[in-house]
């Protein structure tokens, strides 16, 4: 006979049936539901999987750093991943070497960052303004997402030249339009119900990033060529041959603003499974 579990209704004080198992770890410990324990386990697994992160602060529906160039947006996201608890990045000379930019590109980058009061130098150390990037607890009321340091660094450092930085910027430009729970690119990024998310088509995406919709398929091909450890940075849901209608989802391994719940796990697995199939296909071709 299957066991029946009960919980106390907080409103009436009555015992009511529940499918959620209540677990007491040790006498005197806090009582935790099975679902709470499972959530904590998923949270820990996700943290171990994705690694360290910093918070990027922004406003949904508004362009991300509209006053800086596309290439410098990618460079800023890379720099942000080195943010320490006090907002420091590293020495200015060290940072330039780390970014692997020539003198002209470095000057353009630094001038844009300082003119827009994003980065500043103090005693030879570069700092990022806490209005934009935070390592630690967020104290302001704003929209935010996690930038996962290791994978954004791999993305940047994997570029064959600085000319690739503009292409990578498309991934970051859409942050204000990425749904917190699903990482789908959409028109209502704060929507919590997966089924009510109004997904954005590739044609709309082109408009936001300033890309000619006539060349939407070329953009799709460019994005599908961006991988991190074999995983796509951006995936597409395709229902017909008209590429302008394709829907986009960002790999949560790059950035993610929501909870590490079952929905997060679902979308992570989409990218993991695709990477496994991609690897098998390449092995078959090579053999």
Question: What does each model-identified segment do?
Answer:
Residues 79, 247-248:
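Gram-positive cell-envelope targeting signals
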Residues 133-162, 252-284:
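Short, amphipathic alpha-helical interaction segments positioned at domain boundaries
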């Amino acid at each position: 006979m299957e066991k029946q579990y009960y919980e106390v209704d907080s409103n009436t004080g009555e015992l009511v049936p529940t499918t959620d198992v209540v677990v007491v770890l040790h006498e005197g410990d806090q009582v935790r539901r099975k679902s709470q324990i499972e959530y904590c386990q998923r949270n820990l697994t996700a943290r171990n999987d994705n690694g360290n992160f910093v918070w990027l602060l922004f406003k949904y529906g508004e362009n991300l750093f509209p006053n800086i160039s596309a290439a410098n947006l990618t460079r800023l996201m890379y720099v942000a991943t080195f943010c320490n608890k006090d907002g420091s990045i590293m020495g200015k000379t060290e940072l330039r070497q780390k970014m692997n930019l020539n003198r002209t590109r470095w000057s353009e980058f630094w001038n844009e960052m300082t003119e827009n009061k994003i980065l500043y130098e103090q005693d030879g150390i570069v700092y990022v303004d806490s209005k934009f990037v935070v390592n630690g607890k967020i104290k302001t009321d704003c929209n935010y997402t996690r930038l996962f340091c290791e994978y954004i660094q791999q993305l940047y450092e994997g570029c064959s030249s600085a000319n690739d930085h503009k292409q990578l910027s498309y991934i970051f430009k859409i942050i204000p339009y990425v749904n917190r729970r699903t990482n789908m690119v959409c028109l209502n990024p704060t929507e919590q119900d997966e089924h009510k998310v109004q997904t954005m088509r590739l044609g709309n995406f082109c408009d936001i990033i300033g890309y000619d919709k006539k060349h939407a398929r070329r953009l799709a091909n460019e994005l599908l060529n961006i991988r991190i450890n074999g995983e796509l940075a951006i995936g597409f849901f395709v229902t017909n041959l008209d590429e302008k209608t394709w829907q986009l989802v960002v790999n949560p391994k790059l950035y993610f603003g929501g909870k590490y719940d079952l929905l997060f796990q679902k979308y992570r697995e989409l990218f993991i499974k695709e990477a496994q199939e991609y690897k098998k296909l390449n092995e078959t071709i090579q053999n």
